[in-house]
From Swiss-Prot:
Record entry for activity regulation: Inhibited by 4-quinoline drugs (nalidixic acid, ciprofloxacin, ofloxacin), although it is much less sensitive than the corresponding enzyme from E.coli. GyrB intrinsic ATPase activity inhibited by aminopyrazinamide and pyrrolamide derivatives.
Subcellular location: Cytoplasm
Catalytic activity reported: ATP-dependent breakage, passage and rejoining of double-stranded DNA
Name of this protein: DNA gyrase subunit B
Lineage: Bacteria, Bacillati, Actinomycetota, Actinomycetes, Mycobacteriales
Residue span, Toprim domain: 453-567
Reported function: A type II topoisomerase that negatively supercoils closed circular double-stranded (ds) DNA in an ATP-dependent manner to modulate DNA topology and maintain chromosomes in an underwound state. Negative supercoiling favors strand separation, and DNA replication, transcription, recombination and repair, all of which involve strand separation. Also able to catalyze the interconversion of other topological isomers of dsDNA rings, including catenanes and knotted rings. Type II topoisomerases break and join 2 DNA strands simultaneously in an ATP-dependent manner.
Gene that encodes the chain: gyrB
Organism name: Mycolicibacterium smegmatis (strain ATCC 700084 / mc(2)155) (Mycobacterium smegmatis)
Amino acid sequence: MAAQKNNAPKEYGADSITILEGLEAVRKRPGMYIGSTGERGLHHLIWEVVDNAVDEAMAGFATRVDVKIHADGSVEVRDDGRGIPVEMHATGMPTIDVVMTQLHAGGKFDGETYAVSGGLHGVGVSVVNALSTRLEATVLRDGYEWFQYYDRSVPGKLKQGGETKETGTTIRFWADPEIFETTDYNFETVARRLQEMAFLNKGLTIELTDERVTAEEVVDDVVKDTAEAPKTADEKAAEATGPSKVKHRVFHYPGGLVDYVKHINRTKTPIQQSIIDFDGKGPGHEVEIAMQWNAGYSESVHTFANTINTHEGGTHEEGFRAALTSVVNRYAKDKKLLKDKDPNLTGDDIREGLAAVISVKVAEPQFEGQTKTKLGNTEVKSFVQKICNEQLQHWFEANPAEAKTVVNKAVSSAQARIAARKARELVRRKSATDIGGLPGKLADCRSTDPSKSELYVVEGDSAGGSAKSGRDSMFQAILPLRGKIINVEKARIDRVLKNTEVQSIITALGTGIHDEFDISKLRYHKIVLMADADVDGQHISTLLLTLLFRFMKPLVENGHIFLAQPPLYKLKWQRSEPEFAYSDRERDGLLEAGRAAGKKINVDDGIQRYKGLGEMDAKELWETTMDPSVRVLRQVTLDDAAAADELFSILMGEDVEARRSFITRNAKDVRFLDV
């Protein structure tokens, strides 16, 4: 449904607000409410306020949301919805104070104020208030402007301002640095989430502005698909005065999920001209789906419930998968594209190269887990399956040429799967001949406790030799890579599994891949990719990350993957122990500190620039990169699966122009270039 104001007379007032619980435990245990006090938890504050604004749009009462990161680090979220009620509540305080100071107080419990919502689960704007040093709320409703502030959650006195015919809510908050490890918001993280929300709410305009840009930074004003978006007074003023020193993006997608699928497939080659899109409604349920196959080998299916990104899927995805597998097999047999004696195509065969977005709206959602990553409503599966069966069957019958292309791709995938199974069996037989069923070149650790064991995947034989000699063999295993690992983004699974290095990695980890993946069989809970600090080493690391993301994604999702950070420089002092620097800035700092202390650098070889791991002996490698007491490891996390999928497609896929554009666009962010 396009974002249009709903002028229905539904009353939204003090009686709509129900209190469930107070705020006592929030500051004491913030992780219980926002997941963590790190960067992810910090951004969760924005999501909570934005979710409330988007709920107004979903209910038909708002058409735009404006998000601004101020120069002082505070965040402002403004919508043109109905405005938070300000009249006196039954508790004896202004209703806005109830909303801001009582946990789980809101208008989402009666089933009428909001038919569906995404901003309720676990927290709400009251938790944002609890975790902020200050929060300011400006409300436009009942013909007036209202202002309220909260100093460490304690409300001031509600003030009535001038008259206005507009409606809406503006929330501005300052995250508490005593609670959070950082209060520095990531612009791209915020932009991706807001773009996602705009895709999911057809016609809604979401504008993001970042005022923290320094004078030296280039203006980054990216506006896409906004032809139908109404311009604000600020936008008109900006056009008149020219660009300002801010980052600014506007998201507006009249096509909704169709535009989302176009976005996912924009760096890939679609094998069908049209994008399949359909929707359906039932008592308390709605579903909307858009999908299109591409020539690639990876599945890219993204699911949402009440605009919440359900990373772990759930019953809506199960219903979609079951219907898709059934419809394609039935169509293939009916049209003789599969012989009667041929085995059915599997779901994996059919979903190869599929880009799809599934969005459901559920009146009484049941989310599994505190962070709402899996939908648990059992009735949703049958509802989605029924709609998909009807709509997909109709599309296949109405588009025989494109349907045949889709089926042929699935048949080709099945043939590759059979070849891959033979390759896997070959890997198993080969590994069985090695000692303990493990790769012969693996130097295993003595510990048999996976939670205490580490696997270093090391580029090159020489570095592998140094790592074997320098490691702590009690808990550190070493797997050297002798040859070049295959780019899995450009190869089908049967070719991938014939690659010797891939075979070694899969066998060493023990989990299997794809549908055979079993994380309980993981032999090392910390997998460290250790490559040279130059361009070639970074390429090797990217190839390995692509393999892990495409074939063993739960390892990334569960935080088992790390990148080693070997030093770039060795500083040799006269009559003093050498020091190691991991960046140009650290090198300069060590030089300045050393000289200030009266130390002198060696004349001939005082500053050694490492070109590769092989230049370090075993002792140096241990002291700088492998010793748990001093090493630096960067954990690989997966906050946005769609963004990660897109990035791997751009960097490792076939589209050269997309890769060139990405590099050009991000060149200004490169600080160190090894040439």
